[in-house]
């Protein structure tokens, strides 16, 4: 390949940043309900029940980020990003692409898992308006993340197809010569 895979470098750098922040979040300790309650501020117009709902929701979300499955997803995705970068540095573009595809598929699974755990946390909220708002936002964010990952996946597949096509044309030209 004569062209440099800038698209893959950009995607991998973004993915490395995301993986690093996820690892940092995973390594931070799970806050206690008391610590979360102390950090809560009393806002005018917000009932005690809404504050308690927010506390329960926040704690459940924090618990889900420290679950074994989520930790496995984060560690595996970080490993895949590092492996893809190593392949890219060693100029093994095909393996770098395949590894990045694996990372994106894992990210889609992670987005679906996050959505499911957020919906579980929404069940703790008793205020219907607050519950509806949280539910809608979590659906929108999950859909957005999945769409972005599918676009990244489409870009990588398109580039892989173009690379294979260029390689086939190059081989055909060599056969004719």
Language-model features and meaning:
Residues 1-38, 155-164, 175-177:
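Cytosolic juxtamembrane helix and N-cap/initiation of the first transmembrane helix
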Residues 1-12, 60-70, 90-97, 132-142:
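Membrane-water interface of alpha-helical transmembrane segments
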Residues 12-24, 76-81, 107-110:
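Canonical alpha-helical transmembrane segments of integral membrane proteins
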Residues 33-67, 113-141:
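Interfacial non-cytosolic loop connecting adjacent transmembrane helices
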Residues 90-127:
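Hydrophobic alpha-helical transmembrane segments of integral membrane proteins
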Residues 127-165:
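Alpha-helical transmembrane segments and their immediate juxtamembrane flanks
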């Amino acid at each position: 390949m004569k062209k440099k895979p800038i698209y893959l470098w950009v995607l991998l750098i973004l993915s490395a940043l995301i993986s690093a922040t996820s690892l940092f979040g995973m390594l931070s300790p799970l806050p206690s309900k008391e610590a979360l309650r102390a950090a809560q501020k009393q806002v005018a117009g917000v009932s005690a029940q809404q504050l308690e709902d927010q506390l329960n929701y926040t704690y459940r979300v924090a618990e889900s980020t420290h679950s074994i499955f989520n930790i496995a997803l984060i560690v595996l995705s970080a490993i895949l990003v590092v492996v893809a970068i190593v392949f890219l540095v060693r100029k093994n573009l095909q393996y770098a692409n395949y590894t990045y595809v694996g990372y994106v598929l894992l990210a889609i699974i992670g987005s679906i898992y996050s959505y499911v755990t957020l919906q579980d946390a929404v069940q703790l909220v008793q205020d219907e308006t607050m519950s509806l708002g949280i539910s809608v936002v979590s659906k929108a964010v999950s859909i957005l993340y999945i769409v972005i990952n599918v676009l990244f996946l489409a870009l990588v597949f398109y580039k892989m197809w173009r690379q294979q096509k260029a390689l086939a044309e190059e081989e055909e030209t060599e056969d004719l010569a």
